[in-house]
């Protein structure tokens, strides 16, 4: 009897998964019934269950799951257990899309805003200069020494609470959804994998790698909370993070947001016209350059041969979920920032 029930469950999830792959999803259905009604209720349940827990339930669940897999491998027999394995895989994939993954099928912001396929170097330069000027003004407001990098004395819990508060009070927040950032239990692992954070799609916990420079912890936490809101596209999560932080009443949060935006913009400008990018950088106070170097030095510290494997795997994951630019999707936020600036 148990054998038949297992096969019935497997058949149901297989048909769901097959239908999901074959049938094109209606963007309007994802954005309206799912995005406006179904997902907010799922998010509310997860927020109620896990937001008060001071550590990451999702990380703990992954660790236990991986441990159980290694234990079971010793007794694994292909013919006997293949049905259970397939059932588990189909259940996990199905739950992933039902709990959160459907958001990948929303109409992209760049499509709804009718962004051009390319942006001019002139517009890119103007936008980069705009953020450079704003960043310089904020640096002068926070520090009297132009040669000193901006630092915050806040510890991890206070940083994450500040990021959570920033997003909670943002005018961009969906009315029915609340977010909260948590420190991952495995920051060293994420660092070696090259990840600043991630959203657990099952528990909806916004996990942050708190080993990063503190200013980047702030913007990463806001990025992951944007994912909690149902923003799946990486460029859009970056955009929401930047818009929320640059509108904050707290100067150091505004600085962190402008710094993130500037780093994406200056990297794009450097690829388009290295001379113009260098001209912009030459006018920046040394303290801002120190903040930029701090982020670069952190990631260089954790570079390793396996990082490429993780990046390629994540690149394929993103491409399989409607983000054709793959891991380069993060930098596509530049298009949204330039569009904002030229249409201000």
Predicted features along the sequence, with ranges:
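Transmembrane alpha-helices and immediately adjacent membrane-cytoplasm interface residues
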Residues: 62, 67-74, 78-112
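Membrane-interface segments at or immediately adjacent to transmembrane helices
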Residues: 102-171
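Active-site recognition of the HExxH zinc-binding catalytic motif
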Residues: 54, 217-238, 242-243
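Post-HExxH zinc-binding segment in Zn-dependent metallohydrolases
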Residues: 122, 131, 232-276
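Auxiliary, metal-adjacent structural segments of Zn-dependent hydrolase domains
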Residues: 143-210, 214
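Membrane-embedded alpha-helical segments of integral membrane proteins
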Residues: 15-73
